[in-house]
Amino acid sequence: MKNRIFLAGATGAIGRRLLPLLLNAGYEVTGMTRSQAKALEFRGRGMRIVVADVFDADAVMRALRDARPDIVIHQLTDLSALAGSASPTAAISRNARIRSEGTRNLVNAARAVGAQRMIAQSISWAYGPGPLPHVESDPLDVHAGEPRSITVGGINALENAVLNSPPLLGTILRYGQLYGPGTGVDAPRGAAPLHVDAAAYAALLAVQHEAHGIYDIAELDADVVTEKARCELEWRDNMRLPEDAVTHIAV
């Protein structure tokens, strides 16, 4: 019997690409979104969808109790706020709050309902100063000045919560800078680029390989070493989904 999976952020850029991968692999999936309108897209698509705000701890607890997942996948961010905000610092702060308070609510609920594992999205550009390329054991830039400190603080809180909440086994996927459908960026740019399909693929592989710990996930680049993901997860950065696989889930 395949594991039951609870996907927080099911209608986000990565979530939409991850859903067909999970469903085609035979997993029983419950997706969470805060948007009622987006939830309506998923009716009759082979999965359950629940509407809940990650900042509402009671709502998150109810959603996970109903789903009874074996694995929780945390793909929540607020990329739309970062892209369209007139106040970048406010948008960064909201994203950091998702990573700190939102993650805490998910972890608490996952432990309460007996989930065995949590796989969470992080970023690969939060490392502190030091020689390149970075590896997973390098420290985060916890002494950065603002506004970078807001982002790194959120990442630090997320990773600590996911990795240090026994008996929950935690996996951190430190994604590079996303591009591709739904990200608002068409082509690779910046340090450690990553196509959104390859990001989703890494999450699927983390489920299948029962991986735990930290993995850098990015295209071959001078900034981070991704050998661990390529060897342990058999991940590859050139994985791409056929578009009809995605439109079958959400049009």
PLM region descriptions:
Residues 8, 32, 75-78, 118-124, ...:
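SDR active-site strand-loop-helix element
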Residues 83-146:
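Conserved Rossmann-fold NAD(P)-dependent oxidoreductase catalytic core, especially the SDR/UDP-sugar
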Residues 126-131, 143, 168-189:
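Flexible, glycine-rich beta-alpha linker
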Residues 178-182, 190-215, 219-220, 231:
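Alpha-helical substrate-binding/gating segment
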